[in-house]
C-alpha cells in the first residue's frame, strides 16, 4: 500500500495488480482483487454444461445461416487466433470466415503464423489494409493526444469484424477471451458477457472513437478515419450482429492452449526482451517493445505483470517469485524503436520527450529534467532483489526474430523501411 496525492494505492495480496489498473479493479477488505476472485470460478464451474450452452448458441446460427459462412473470427498472427479457430472449425464443426486487420508492424513470424493458420485450417480470410499514409497520420495524432501508438490497431481489429458482419450478413462473431473478465474480473463467467460498442470505446479506444479524433486534431479529416467508424444501431439490429467470447464457455488457459497449438499446428513462438512469455504478440514489433514501455509509463506496470498475474492465479508461480521476475524484466530495453521512428518520421529524442509527459506521477518520481525514479510495486519493496535467473515457468521457443529485422507491410506490397 502506498499514498500518492492524498489517495491510497492498494495492491492485491495474491497477484501484482494495483487499484490503479486502467480497466478498473476492486480490492476487497481481505486485500484480494476482483480478478483473482473471478478467476476462482474456473475451478468451480461445470465446464461440460457451459460447453453445451455454447453448442446450443452456435447450432442456431448453423441452421439459420443465409450464406456459406456460419460465423466470423477476428484473427492475427499470434495470441488466441489458432485456438479460437481450432475450437470453432474442428470442435464446433462450423465454417468461419476469418478477418484480419493489417497492423503494419508485422514481424516475419506473425506473417508465417497467419499463413499457417489459413493453410492448416483451410479457411477463407479477408484482410483490411488501410492506406499506410492514413495509418501514420492517425498514429501520430493518437501518440500526441493519448500517448498511444496502438489506437489504430485496437480500433481496426475490433471494428473490422463488425463491418464485415454487416456487409456479408453474417450475424455471429466469435472472439477468444474477454480481457476485462480475465484480467480484472469485470464480469463473471456466468454473465456470458458479449461484445459491446461501449466497452470498445471506454477501454480498447481509451474513450476516443474515430469521430472524436477528427474534432481533436487539425490534421485528420473524415476521409482519414472513416474505415474505423462503428456501424450504427440500425445496421447492427438489421443483421442481428452479436459477438460472443469463448472464454465464457471454455476454461481459458492461454499458456496451456498455446502449447497445444505449438504441438498440433506448428504455431511459431519467440523470446522477447521484456518478458518470459514466448507466445503472446509475436506478430508485432511494437506491442512487447515500445507499446509496452508506454504502458509502464502510463500505468505503472507492463505486460510481464499481466502475464505473471495470470500465472499466479493458475498456481504456476508464487507471488514473491513473480515480483522478482517483474523487476527483472519490466524496465528492460525496448527494441526496434528505430524502425518506428523511421516509419513515423520522428526522431528518438522527440519521442522520449513526448513519452515522459505521459508518465504517471503515482508511479514515477522526477529527479531532474531527464531522470526519473520508478516507484511501482516491484521497486517499492526493498526486500525484492532482482533474480539472476528466470522463474521456473517454462516456455517453448521455436523461432527467433533478428534484431535488424524490418516491418513487413503487406498492405501495399512488401517494403523495407
Model-derived features: positions:
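Hydrophobic positions on the alpha1 helix immediately C-terminal to the Walker A/P-loop
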Residues: 83-84
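Nucleotide-activated chemistry modules centered on ATP-dependent adenylation/adenylyltransferase
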Residues: 1-71, 87-373, 380-417
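Short, glycine-rich nucleotide/cofactor-binding loops
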Residues: 71-80
Amino acid at each position: 500500500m502506498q499514498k500518492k496525492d492524498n489517495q491510497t494505492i492498494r495492491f492485491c495480496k495474491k497477484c501484482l495488480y494495483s487499484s490503479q489498473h486502467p480497466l478498473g479493479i476492486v480490492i476487497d477488505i481481505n486485500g484480494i482483487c476482483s480478478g483473482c476472485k473471478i478467476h476462482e470460478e474456473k475451478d468451480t464451474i461445470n465446464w461440460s454444461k457451459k460447453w453445451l450452452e455454447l453448442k446450443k448458441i452456435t447450432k442456431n446460427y448453423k441452421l439459420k445461416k443465409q450464406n456459406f459462412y456460419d460465423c466470423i473470427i477476428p484473427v492475427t498472427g499470434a495470441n488466441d487466433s489458432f485456438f479460437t479457430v481450432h475450437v470453432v472449425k474442428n470442435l464446433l464443426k462450423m465454417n468461419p470466415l476469418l478477418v484480419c486487420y493489417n497492423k503494419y508492424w508485422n514481424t516475419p513470424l506473425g506473417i508465417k503464423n497467419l499463413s499457417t493458420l489459413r493453410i492448416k485450417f483451410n479457411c477463407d480470410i479477408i484482410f483490411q489494409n488501410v492506406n499506410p499514409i492514413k495509418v501514420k497520420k492517425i498514429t501520430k495524432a493518437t501518440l500526441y493526444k493519448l500517448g498511444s501508438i496502438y489506437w489504430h490497431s485496437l480500433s481496426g481489429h475490433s471494428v473490422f469484424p463488425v463491418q464485415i458482419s454487416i456487409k456479408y450478413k453474417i450475424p455471429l462473431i466469435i472472439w477468444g477471451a474477454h480481457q476485462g473478465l480475465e484480467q480484472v474480473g469485470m464480469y463473471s463467467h456466468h454473465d456470458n458477457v458479449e461484445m459491446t460498442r461501449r466497452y470498445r470505446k471506454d477501454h480498447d479506444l481509451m474513450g476516443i472513437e474515430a469521430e472524436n479524433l477528427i474534432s481533436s486534431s487539425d490534421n485528420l479529416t473524415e476521409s482519414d478515419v472513416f474505415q474505423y467508424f462503428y456501424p450504427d444501431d440500425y445496421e447492427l439490429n438489421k443483421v442481428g450482429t452479436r459477438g460472443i467470447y469463448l472464454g465464457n464457455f471454455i476454461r481459458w488457459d492461454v499458456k496451456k492452449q498455446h502449447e497445444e497449438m505449438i504441438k498440433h499446428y506448428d504455431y511459431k513462438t519467440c523470446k522477447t526482451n521484456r518478458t518470459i512469455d514466448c507466445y503472446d504478440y509475436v506478430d508485432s514489433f511494437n506491442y512487447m517493445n515500445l507499446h509496452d514501455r508506454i504502458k509502464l509509463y502510463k500505468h505503472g506496470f507492463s505486460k510481464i505483470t499481466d502475464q505473471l498475474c495470470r500465472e499466479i492465479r493458475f498456481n504456476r508461480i508464487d507471488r514473491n517469485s513473480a515480483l522478482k521476475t517483474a523487476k527483472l524484466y519490466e524496465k528492460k530495453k525496448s527494441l526496434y524503436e528505430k524502425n518506428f521512428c523511421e516509419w513515423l518520421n520522428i526522431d528518438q529524442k522527440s519521442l522520449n520527450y513526448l513519452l515522459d509527459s505521459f508518465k504517471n506521477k503515482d508511479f514515477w518520481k522526477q529527479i531532474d529534467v531527464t531522470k526519473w525514479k520508478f516507484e511501482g510495486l516491484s521497486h517499492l519493496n526493498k526486500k525484492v532483489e532482482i533474480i539472476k535467473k528466470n522463474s521456473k515457468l517454462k516456455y517453448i521457443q521455436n523461432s527467433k526474430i533478428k534484431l535488424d529485422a524490418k516491418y513487413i507491410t503487406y498492405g501495399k506490397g512488401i517494403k523495407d523501411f
